[in-house]
Curated annotation (Swiss-Prot):
Protein name as catalogued: Glycine-rich RNA-binding, abscisic acid-inducible protein
Listed Gly residues bias regions: 87-157
Keywords assigned by UniProt, alphabetized: RNA-binding, Stress response
RRM domain mapped to chain residues: 8-86
SUPFAM superfamilies for this protein: RNA-binding domain, RBD
A GO molecular-function annotation: mRNA binding
Organism: Zea mays
SMART domains: RRM (SM00360)
Lineage: Eukaryota, Viridiplantae, Streptophyta, Embryophyta, Tracheophyta
Length: 157
């Protein structure tokens, strides 16, 4: 990634279904200039998927927002705020408690994103599963699973 392509983007999880792009932006506006705010919605239903992204113009603004907003309440729900993972491939194996076959927080598969592959601490015995398993947060959904505890697969020898 070239220096000009650097994005200072936060992942915001645990959003209320009612949270809009505007209310997400308003909640983070005091931390610096916001270039973009987006609540991710289901393509078919148009309903919020419970997470979104906020992109800042500077790294300091992003870091302040992460430090001050993580665990805070927005629209009646406690939110999780982290630095967003790159859109590129996952981190390859391991990660946050990742067991067999990749897994972990953004590890394993090229469709990457949060929990791509085995999911958030998932063991990956037959696919899917875990916190965002399969497509995962920010993943391209090149296969089953996806979402909170996304399904798919079973025990496999």
């Amino acid at each position: 990634m070239a220096a000009a392509d650097v994005e200072y983007r936060c992942f915001v999880g645990g959003l209320a279904w009612a949270t809009s792009n505007e209310s997400l932006e308003n909640a983070f506006a005091s931390y610096g200039e916001i270039l973009d705010s987006k609540v991710i919605t289901d393509r078919e239903t148009g309903r919020s998927r419970g997470f979104g992204f906020v992109t800042f113009s500077s790294e300091n603004s992003m870091l302040d927002a992460i430090e001050n907003m993580n665990g805070k309440e927005l629209d009646g729900r406690n939110i999780t705020v982290n630095q967003a993972q790159s859109r590129g491939g996952g981190g390859g194996g391991g990660g946050y408690g990742g067991g067999r076959g990749g897994g972990g927080y953004g590890g394993g598969r090229r469709d990457g994103g949060y929990g791509g592959g085995g999911g958030y601490g998932g063991r990956r015995e037959g696919g899917g599963g875990g916190y965002g398993g399969g497509g995962g947060y920010g993943g391209r959904r090149e296969g089953g699973g996806g979402g909170y505890g996304g399904g798919g697969g079973g025990w496999r020898d």
